[in-house]
Amino acid sequence: MKSVLKIRMSAHDAHYGGGLVDGARMLQLFGDVATELLIMNDGDEGLFKAYDMVEFMAPVFAGDYIEVEGSITEQGNTSRKMIFEARKVIVPRTDINDSACDVLETPIVVCRASGTCVVPKDKQRK
């Protein structure tokens, strides 16, 4: 089972100079993917317990399109182990003009993570 979201980073997402987006934004998107996976798997939003690993691999800027994918890799009674990957798939080309963008032939992996979510037994509906 997997979930995929695609979202454009806005000027509001930019936190640092040069339009750089805070890495925590990727973790927020991983949380959204995890929530969708838990709803699909258990019929409940569940709770994110912990990240086992987070690796930031490339910068993200306002205007970038990010595709976020996650999947459940292990399932216990209440725990769900998951992996996540965020990839930059479209980038602005302000060097050409203010509205130009390119679809990347090869997406750039910007962040990877793994973690554990929990759905209490009494809230599992599937």
UniProtKB/Swiss-Prot annotation:
It catalyses: (3S)-3-aminobutanoyl-CoA = (2E)-butenoyl-CoA + NH4(+). Its EC number is 4.3.1.14. Pathway: Amino-acid degradation; L-lysine degradation via acetate pathway. One of its GO terms (biological process) is L-lysine catabolic process to acetate. It comes from the Bacteria. Belongs to the KAL family. This is 3-aminobutyryl-CoA ammonia lyase. It comes from Acetoanaerobium sticklandii (strain ATCC 12662 / DSM 519 / JCM 1433 / CCUG 9281 / NCIMB 10654 / HF) (Clostridium sticklandii).
